A protein has these predicted regions:
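Terminal (often C-terminal
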Residues: 1-53, 61-66, 133-147
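Terminal beta-strand-rich extracellular "head" domains
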Residues: 57-111, 117-147
Length: 147
């Protein structure tokens, strides 16, 4: 009788937090097709039965109008996730903290670069990243062990 065990293990973990508090550092969200970009490198050993869990938190402020802000995550310049959010400005809900999670599955072996980008899709409206800003990637593998 064979007993097969599925073993989950951490392959790699990387994180960056360039802005830890609201207002610590701010920058305008560029109008599309330009983007603000934050990058991480993460290793993945086995191309079968693995995944990379990505988590981003971004504090934004509406400056003028209502901005449609697009957040994207790329692996090696290939988009693997996106989310769009409406950001209002003065006389409304002006500050937002967006947190989202993406799961990239069956990633090929090797080291990969993940990029988090943000861009404003609405001309005539403006928004800023005001913090906090963090981006993390956790590579998880699953092995099958026998007997």
């Amino acid at each position: 009788m064979k007993i097969v065990k599925n073993m989950t293990h951490i392959i790699d973990y990387q994180a960056t937090q360039p802005i830890s508090k609201t207002g610590e550092t701010t920058f305008a969200i560029p109008s599309s097709p330009n983007k603000a970009n934050l990058k991480l490198r993460i290793s993945s050993r086995d191309s079968r039965n693995n995944r990379v869990e990505l988590i981003a938190t971004i504090g934004v402020e509406g400056i003028t109008g209502t901005s449609q802000v697009l957040f994207r995550i790329f692996r090696d310049n290939i988009e693997v996730f996106n989310a769009q959010v409406g950001i209002e400005s003065t006389d409304s809900e002006q500050f937002y903290v967006q947190t989202f999670q993406a799961i990239d599955q069956n990633v090929s072996s090797g080291t990969h670069e993940y990029s988090l980008t943000v861009e404003n899709l609405t001309s005539g409206a403006s928004a800023e990243v005001v913090g906090p800003l963090s981006f993390s990637a956790l590579a998880i593998g699953k092995e099958q062990k026998c007997c």
